[in-house]
């Protein structure tokens, strides 16, 4: 008896939420009974959303007269801007879209990781080196590196051991993802839902569609923020909050232009 499984009619998940109904059983030829989730398609997001469809908000940039035909507003944060034609090929577009979402999420986590330790340290909470690009160097100190300043958690003394653990753990996860490992009841690898949505944020299709847009917006800002943190670390040797405090204390002498002029030849 074939399982009553409904396939999604669209390759995207933008503007839609998928709800899992109760499990249905399938009897295989060897007499075993397997269980799988039955997928039903929920009501799509309203077509009046300003973020989706042909009438969505657009930013075409200075070199584009109109949005290309392949950018239809089907996906979140599609503003119709693709002057270089990076999304013209559907397979490349799908890959780049996945990479952007992944990098957005990493950047948002990274930005928090750069700011919060310094914020805690400035408010009297000590847990080791607070400046993000200096924290890892503590492993070369005589006492090694204590995660969160607590030797009872992880006490690291070998950079090679840390590197090996990072390669094994992250490599295994990335390899599993790239190979398209079985995702169980997951419908969309970018927005898996189910156990990955304990707060039920995806239950309302319209709210979920808007949350996708907010995620990409904040993720793009986070990627720019991380780039700024990298440049600040190289130029000033300080953390983001210390740079901000210096700028607020003396904005005339502590700004991007004043630091840039330090690299002028002959100065």
From Swiss-Prot:
Q: How is it modified after translation?
A: Photoregulated by reversible phosphorylation of its threonine residues.
The UniProt record gives the binding positions of chlorophyll b 1 as 59
Provide the binding site for chlorophyll a 1.
81, 87, 100, 220
Cofactor info, note text: Binds at least 14 chlorophylls (8 Chl-a and 6 Chl-b) and carotenoids such as lutein and neoxanthin.
Complexes and interactors: The LHC complex consists of chlorophyll a-b binding proteins.
Q: Name the positions where chlorophyll a 2 binds.
A: 103
Residues bearing Phosphothreonine are 38
Query: Gene symbol?
Result: CAB22R
The name this protein carries in UniProt is Chlorophyll a-b binding protein 22R, chloroplastic
Q: Does the keyword Glycoprotein apply?
A: no
User: Which residues are involved in binding chlorophyll b 3?
Assistant: 158, 174
One further remark on this entry is: There are at least 16 genes for the major CAB protein which can be classified into at least 5 small multigene families.
Q: Which residues are recorded as modified (N2-acetylarginine)?
A: 36
Q: Where is chlorophyll a 3 bound in this sequence?
A: 138, 148, 215
Among SUPFAM superfamilies, the record links this protein to: Chlorophyll a-b binding protein
Query: Which Pfam families did the record assign?
Result: Chloroa_b-bind
The membrane-spanning stretches of this chain are 101-121, 153-173, 221-241
**GO MF:** chlorophyll binding; metal ion binding
Domain notes per entry = The N-terminus of the protein extends into the stroma where it is involved with adhesion of granal membranes and post-translational modifications; both are believed to mediate the distribution of excitation energy between photosystems I and II.
Q: What are the binding positions for chlorophyll a 5 in this chain? A: 214, 232
Transit peptide span? 1-35
Q: Which GO terms describe its cellular component?
A: chloroplast thylakoid membrane; photosystem I; photosystem II
Q: Where does chlorophyll a 6 bind?
A: 247, 256
């Amino acid at each position: 008896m074939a399982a009553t499984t409904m396939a999604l009619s669209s390759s995207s998940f933008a503007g839609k939420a998928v709800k899992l109904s109760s499990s249905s059983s399938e009897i295989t030829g060897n007499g075993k009974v397997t269980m799988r989730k039955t997928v039903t398609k929920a009501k799509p997001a309203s077509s009046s959303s300003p973020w989706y469809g042909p009438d969505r908000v657009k930013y075409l940039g200075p070199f584009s007269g109109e949005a290309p035909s392949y950018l239809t507003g089907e996906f979140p944060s599609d503003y119709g801007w693709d002057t270089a034609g990076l999304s013209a090929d559907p397979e490349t577009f799908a890959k780049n879209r996945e990479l952007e979402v992944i990098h957005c999420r990493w950047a948002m986590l990274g930005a928090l990781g750069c700011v919060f330790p310094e914020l805690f340290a400035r408010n009297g909470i000590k847990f080791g080196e607070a400046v993000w690009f200096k924290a890892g160097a503590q492993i070369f100190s005589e006492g090694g590196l204590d995660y969160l300043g607590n030797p009872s958690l992880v006490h690291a003394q070998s950079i090679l051991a840390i590197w090996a653990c990072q390669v094994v753990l992250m490599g295994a996860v990335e390899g599993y993802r790239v190979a398209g490992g079985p995702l169980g009841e997951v419908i969309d690898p970018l927005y898996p839902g189910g156990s990955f949505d304990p707060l039920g944020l995806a239950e309302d299709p319209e709210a979920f569609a808007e949350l996708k847009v907010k995620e990409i917006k904040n993720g793009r800002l986070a990627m720019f923020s991380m780039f700024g943190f990298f440049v600040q670390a190289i130029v000033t040797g300080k953390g983001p909050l210390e740079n901000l405090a210096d700028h607020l204390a003396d904005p005339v002498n502590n700004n991007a232009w004043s630091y840039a002029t330090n690299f002028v030849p002959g100065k």
